[in-house]
């Protein structure tokens, strides 16, 4: 997606060979026009997949997930990282390790929002080692729902997340596939 590539080149900051900072437009400050384009693109890619729900993890996946849900006309559910007094029922949950934050946390969704008849599209800001995606897949399976695909805004292709998801037979659509961050330069798989 050329608009996303351009934004990454202009405003992304390479912090190391492993870490790309995109807080200027995606995971701190949000560019609404770019999110609209991202939602349009994911909706086009998955329009014939029978999606009934979109699932993401708070917080950075919420903006692209909402725009995709708006385009597809389906609800968006975000897995919470922190317990809430309003989440009182037996939750669908999984643990996830954050590569960027270097911490493990439990994410949870109320079972009232996912059913066995749902076809779920996972939307996330990044795909690195695939741990967040695997946690969401686990939660969706706990509900008996079907994972219809994964929409990733930025994939770090040099890490193993996509290979793992591919080997499990999941459809993965990434809007920007980063080949390398070596030398402080973002190189894309075109």
Swiss-Prot record:
Its EC number is 2.4.2.22. Its main location: cytoplasm. It is found in: Cytoplasm. Xanthine binds at residues 20, 27, 156. The gene is xpt. 5-phospho-alpha-D-ribose 1-diphosphate binds at residues 128-132. The keyword Cell division does not apply. Pathway: Purine metabolism; XMP biosynthesis via salvage pathway; XMP from xanthine: step 1/1. Belongs to the purine/pyrimidine phosphoribosyltransferase family. Xpt subfamily. Keywords: Cytoplasm, Glycosyltransferase, Purine salvage, Transferase. InterPro entries: PRibTrfase_dom (IPR000836), PRTase-like (IPR029057), Pur/Pyrimidine_PRTase (IPR050118), Xanthine_PRibTrfase (IPR010079). Transmembrane segments: none annotated. GO terms for biological process: purine ribonucleoside salvage; xanthine metabolic process; XMP salvage. It catalyses: XMP + diphosphate = xanthine + 5-phospho-alpha-D-ribose 1-diphosphate. One of its GO terms (cellular component) is cytoplasm. It is an enzyme of class 2 (transferase). Homodimer. GO terms for molecular function: xanthine phosphoribosyltransferase activity. Converts the preformed base xanthine, a product of nucleic acid breakdown, to xanthosine 5'-monophosphate (XMP), so it can be reused for RNA or DNA synthesis. This is Xanthine phosphoribosyltransferase.
């Amino acid at each position: 997606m050329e608009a996303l590539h351009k934004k990454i080149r202009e405003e992304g900051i390479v912090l190391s060979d492993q870490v790309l900072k995109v807080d200027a437009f995606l995971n701190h400050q949000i560019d609404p026009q770019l999110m609209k384009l991202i939602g349009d693109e994911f909706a086009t890619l998955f329009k014939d997949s029978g999606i009934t729900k979109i699932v993401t993890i708070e917080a950075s996946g919420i903006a692209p997930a909402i725009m995709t849900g708006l385009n597809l006309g389906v609800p968006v559910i975000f897995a919470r990282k922190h317990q809430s007094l309003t989440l009182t029922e037996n939750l669908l949950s999984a643990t996830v390790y954050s590569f960027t934050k270097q911490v493990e946390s439990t994410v949870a969704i109320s079972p009232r929002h996912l059913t066995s008849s749902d076809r779920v599209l996972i939307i996330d800001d990044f795909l690195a080692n695939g741990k967040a995606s695997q946690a969401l897949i686990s939660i969706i399976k706990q509900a008996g729902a079907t994972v219809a695909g994964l929409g990733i805004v930025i994939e770090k292709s040099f890490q193993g997340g996509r290979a793992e998801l591919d080997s499990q037979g999941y459809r993965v659509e990434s809007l920007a596939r980063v080949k390398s961050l070596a030398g402080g330069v973002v190189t894309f798989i075109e």
